[in-house]
């Protein structure tokens, strides 16, 4: 029974709950970034280079068997080696956007933390003040 109570104490500790909330929000945010990349950015890039669907961009590295369709999935199922760079490009763009957004959030957080006023230094103890006064009066003699 001791292990269960230890686990409950661990699980309800603030840091674990904060981490769980962060993971859930991060997963939802990842879906938003995926949508921004797949639905907004990649179609614009595809319009510029002439292809709308990056996932279908690949290079066949060997001759496919006769009668094999030339789609990426069909070639993979047939065991034909393909260099499928389209999906990789989408994931790289996705990563760069996510990394930039996280950078902006951390930067804003650091600026807010730096803007907080620093605590005033603590006043010296009364003994130190008295000793300084004695020192100063001895210097003037």
Curated annotation (Swiss-Prot):
Q: Where in the cell is it found?
A: Cell inner membrane
Q: Name one GO cellular component term.
A: plasma membrane
Q: What is its main location?
A: membrane
The record's section on InterPro entries has: Mechanosensitive_channel_CS, MS_channel, MSC/AndL, MscL_channel
Question: Disulfide connectivity?
Answer: none
State the superkingdom: Bacteria
UniProt membrane topology term? Multi-pass membrane protein
Instruction: Give any GO molecular function from the UniProt entry.
Output: mechanosensitive monoatomic ion channel activity
What does the UniProt keyword field contain?
A: Cell inner membrane, Cell membrane, Ion channel, Ion transport, Membrane, Transmembrane, Transmembrane helix, Transport
- Where does the chain cross the membrane? 16-36, 40-60, 86-106
Q: Subunit composition?
A: Homopentamer.
Role summary: Channel that opens in response to stretch forces in the membrane lipid bilayer. May participate in the regulation of osmotic pressure changes within the cell.
What is stated as this protein's family in its record?
Answer: Belongs to the MscL family.
- What is the protein named? Large-conductance mechanosensitive channel
Protein source organism: Cupriavidus necator (strain ATCC 17699 / DSM 428 / KCTC 22496 / NCIMB 10442 / H16 / Stanier 337)
